[in-house]
Amino acid sequence: MKRSMYAGRVRSEHIGTSITLKGWVGRRRDLGGLIFIDLRDREGIMQLVINPEEVSASVMATAESLRSEFVIEVSGVVTAREQANDNLPTGEVELKVQELSILNTSKTTPFEIKDGIEANDDTRMRYRYLDLRRPEMLENFKLRAKVTHSIRNYLDNLEFIDVETPMLTKSTPEGARDYLVPSRVNQGHFYALPQSPQITKQLLMNAGFDRYYQIVKCFRDEDLRGDRQPEFTQVDLETSFLSDQEIQDIVEGMIAKVMKDTKGLEVSLPFPRMAYDDAMNNYGSDKPDTRFDMLLQDLTEIVKEVDFKVFSEASVVKAIVVKDKADKYSRKNIDKLTEIAKQYGAKGLAWLKYADNTISGPVAKFLTAIEGRLTEALQLENNDLILFVADSLEVANETLGALRTRIAKELELIDYSKFNFLWVVDWPMFEWSEEEGRYMSAHHPFTLPTAETAHELEGDLAKVRAVAYDIVLNGYELGGGSLRINQKDTQERMFKALGFSAESAQEQFGFLLEAMDYGFPPHGGLAIGLDRFVMLLAGKDNIREVIAFPKNNKASDPMTQAPSLVSEQQLEELSLTVESYEN
């Protein structure tokens, strides 16, 4: 029979109606001769009642054979429950079953199909099709669908054109490692799966499309963590003839619409703007979480003349104050923080406690001469804990930034109901790579340098600033964008600054440089990580929770066993040999 409606949508207005439902058996309970079944589908749970006095013997026998996750079809009449269940949207009604049939049986599942299970991640991914049956997972993907629907509506209304760009592209340097795809037709040659549609979307601007967008899969062969996957989805957009401010306005409007459509929240516009240097110096991060205080404070000038070489000879001395929580941190707890500090390159972690109008701790004896100035500068109050890092500016900022976030989580200082958006602007164009021993693009090599600093492309690269902007939400980089280079000579200068020879630049990016000979318009854009955005909206801490079939931390799929070995014949067709491998 045809299904009448979703089980989770039956309400009191349907009382007296004969309906047919289809779904999975959640729980089965036998009480006083009656059998109660929780029927589950994607919209929720509906209670079924099978009364032996009202159904045939065959229906009763079928009901008695039901087990969890059997797929069934039932028909009956909607009636009012004697005692409502306020925990269910369907809690005022139940279905008095008249007909029942089994559409499929099920083995015992490796974990219960319910929220809050304790199965490990690999088990959940091994049986992902079962994991996705759980209500909280279904809700995550309904939310994701609402987000993409809202984004498409917004951008369509602004006359953006949805264009699909190639999945098989050219491998180019800079950025993460590419996933390579060997070509059978062009032996010895490889495609790359795109890390982003960066160059192709810029070429669409040269084609006169003016406003482009795409919700697109991207691929990066990089080390994984909670907010990264080897394949991920981004909301990609590009525009012509707009300023960076105008692009940011468009993105803010899009996010405001998503927040209204999915969470019912009105966000305040425009978003705050914070210079990159301020973010690093005050928060120790280029993606600052502004839901709590505990800002980094520079004490270099105050401590430079103390008789403590760790402080007096350091490039900088910075500190954070953990307000009114000194009693929460024993020596053992502080030692744990010290180990974290060392992971970020710090040589150690100095600390003080402030109580009864005086400082105490291992370094207190060195600071008595400046205790008053220190107390005033840090606005110390009873039971404050002060943590110091004396090192280079970069190490001090990064270390204290990491400790700031760690401590805020430990002490539950974060208001998780807040959605704090902000722009980080005024970025450096380059960042120094110790591993590479050279400057690399902070974003990518197509970012436009500011007019005031472009001359430093042939000088001090540390002084070059970019017309770039990142959008940050609650301590996560939600997306990044910039105005792009559209002048050939500037692009060639950029490649040279990054260490490309003229021949190498031509080999890697000749098609882009050639396009710049044909009236390339001023343009810019942005990409937002869709998975990360949905993760934050759903209140999760891992993007696997909002990706239907994710990979684990080894970039593997426990369900399909991808990646896998391939046959010798397949390798021969590609003229490839595998020298060695480990199972």
Curated annotation (Swiss-Prot):
Positions bound to L-aspartate: 174, 220, 443, 484
Listed transmembrane segments: none
GO terms, molecular function: aspartate-tRNA ligase activity; ATP binding; catalytic activity, acting on a protein; nucleic acid binding; transferase activity
Residues where ATP binds: 220-222, 229, 477, 529-532
Entry annotated with the keyword Aminoacyl-tRNA synthetase: yes
Segments of this protein annotated with the region Aspartate: 198-201
Protein name: Aspartate--tRNA ligase
